[in-house]
Amino acid sequence: VLSPRENETLTFLALGYSRAQVAHTLCISENTLRVYIESARYKLGAANTTHAVSLAVSRGLILL
């Protein structure tokens, strides 16, 4: 259900990257990154970013 970019974003966050590192790695602004995170949170019904990462991992949406 996650877009490829939302998936990449949550994967990097799960691996311990900071938001700045994720944005740099994906060649996007931190504002754009925030939009991807918020969209993923909404789709997953997560309360925060950590919860979104946890849900994505537990549902098998991202592999570590």
Which residues are covered by each model-predicted region?
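Regulatory hinge/linker segments at domain boundaries
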Residues: 1-8, 12
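A cross-family signal for key residues in well-ordered alpha-helices
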Residues: 11, 24, 54
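Short helix-to-turn junction characteristic of helix-turn-helix DNA-binding domains
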Residues: 13-17, 56
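Recognition helix of helix-turn-helix DNA-binding domains
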Residues: 18-51
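Short, basic, alpha-helical segments at the C-terminal edge of helix-turn-helix-like DNA-binding modules
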Residues: 49-60
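Short C-terminal boundary/hinge segments that cap the last helix of small helical domains
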Residues: 62-64
